[in-house]
Amino acid sequence: MIRQDAWNALGQPDHFVRYAVDGVWTPWEYVNPPMQLGVEYRTTERHNNKPVYKKAVNTGALSAGTSKSVAHGVQDIGLRLSALYGLNNDGDNLVGNPGITGILVDGSNITITTAAGFSTSNSWVVIAYTKTTD
């Protein structure tokens, strides 16, 4: 087995790895994904020997006392491991926030249920999942 490491030449902290096993290279995987909105990252993490993917999804402004569903755009999503964290422009973490009563990730959407409003700022959620194709 051969391991190949690469870093972003522009000074970003991006670190990628891949392996050659019996002359066949595995896909590039992120050690520290940069988490740009809407980009899916295959990571070096594993769950039941399957690669874990991460994606940051813009969920917009959140009104008080409502549920909002936003399509995450993930194809072939398998096990939804978690909504790792969610943030708004004020730096509030939405996971564990008393103003957020639930964040649910299903096969198509992220649904956020609120008790308090976050309508004056944008929000986004980072999800972690496996894929049925791996």
What is each PLM-predicted segment?
Residues 50-124, 130-134:
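Extracellular attachment/recognition segments
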Residues 15-17, 43, 102:
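Short, surface-exposed charged micro-motifs
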Residues 1-33, 88-90:
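Trimeric beta-solenoid/beta-helix "fiber body" segments of extracellular/virion adhesins
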Residues 3-5, 40-42, 100, 113-114:
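Generic recognition of flexible, low-complexity loop/linker segments
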Residues 21-54, 76-78, 134:
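Glycine-rich, low-complexity segments
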